[in-house]
């Protein structure tokens, strides 16, 4: 039997067959993994190595009417307290909070604590403890709703298991943070913290504290603090909706708990435009936790660019001249004075400038807060929109229009000033010139009465016109009611029998004649006075006062909104009435106000006022408009304890000159390349 001469060749063929089969199987598996199930496997790989992260959109910028950037953004760091890592270990959470508080106290850092209870050795509930949202918090946590401060604090200590090793003062600070965390796993503890504090946080000793990047506000001006406003973390009472008041909380608006929101001013008023839409991204990491890539599944959209009606150059002049005028009134109580000024564009209601004195610096607001709160001059109080003052003789313009339009008098009607008004047995008020010099203004018409500010003339005209008609015209001028300004204001008081009855006050015939000269119960804001004059010199077109000019997308590529409201009402003041009233205002600038208005670059009209607020103490009021023959701007200035309104004439001239000598070029708003993501 012969042997196979080539046994090795057969083995080669067998091995080659096995190898080919292996290759076929390998490529089949590879095809299945890469092609058939490729997308599924890639998704599984990403899921196992990535985490989804919210990318906070930067807040929109704010500009003046000429595009000059007033508020923008910069990169900053925030501290977020997250209780989820503590589980049910209340003691560890409280200890971590206390360590963080001690660090912040050491570094002089303020943190977000809106619990309506004072801090210190004997914490006391504040007036905010009466709000519906806080009462709801107490109910939800079965805390005493009618207990005293000590009882509420003790109950909160028990609720959050704050042990007896902490004093009441320390416990108050801890429960303040626990209050913020109620109903949520984390909250923004502090914003825009220093790099020094960050270094302390990152040493690993502060459990439950994370550092996040955020866009902090940059204030490119020290002006308009009361207009621009501030931003801050969402407070507990802002988070929840309140059905009883109709308030819609940020939770129901789609916000994240740690978002920054506007707290006051235009930051709050235009929150819907300034707040951007957050993005989402997937962060890919390796086995060591090192980031190896990122994928944006939704790009963040920065907030819109809000252009205000304010002219920041005019705002500078208004703030400076108001401050120098008040500071120049040298006497023992000059430091107690405050004041406000407003400038409105005639025929639109646009607020061109608005100042309140004293003011503050938004850039250092958080650091200065404690001192600002203690300042008895109330620098955070916006006197232009929240302060109410008797208008004094500036109200005589309204009385003049009412009497002329109703046919009570004509432009040529003569009334003789007899010094003491004796129509009533009581009261029998005197004209100011009789009280001061024992003389009278003689026989005068309405234009002359405006120049002389003759009280006797307006006592008689007020009596003849009656309070019903006076109030009808005052209301049409917008006095005693909100101006509609977006940052909010108070209505003030329009004197009337109905108001007096509703507030348990007396109303007599004497109230009517004193109301006619701007006294009685009349109390208006400086912004109301400016809008009243703007309405008057326009012939009666009454507009809402407003700060919004337009809103554009963050890259200025499209217009989102433009203010476009027409007049609220129109008095349709007759030409003869307009001529008589504006003649009086114009003549005044050539009479007792000549020294101030001699340097005015355009012809103007004005009216002074002085309102008694105590024995030998009076607030000074002043209104003006320009130009005389084609009104463009209206001005109101009020100075507490300012005496005669004539002392404010120079400030008004400064404002008029600034407006009519401006170059009007403005600046270009920042484009998208100037914005953060």
Model-identified regions with their sequence ranges:
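Membrane-proximal periplasmic segments of bacterial cell-envelope enzymes
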Residues: 1-274, 278-299, 332, 339-340
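Short amphipathic alpha-helical signal-transduction/dimerization elements
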Residues: 537, 589, 653-664
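Conserved, well-ordered alpha-helix/loop/beta-strand core segments that scaffold catalytic motifs
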Residues: 186, 291-339
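Solvent-exposed, polar/charged alpha-helical surfaces in well-ordered, non-transmembrane soluble domains
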Residues: 91-98, 102, 195, 199, ...
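Gram-negative outer-membrane assembly/targeting C-terminal domains
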Residues: 663-677
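Flexible, solvent-exposed loop/hinge segments and secondary-structure transition points
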Residues: 59, 205, 321-348, 356, ...
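Beta-lactam-recognizing serine transpeptidase/beta-lactamase-like catalytic domain environment
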Residues: 71, 77, 285-301, 310, ...
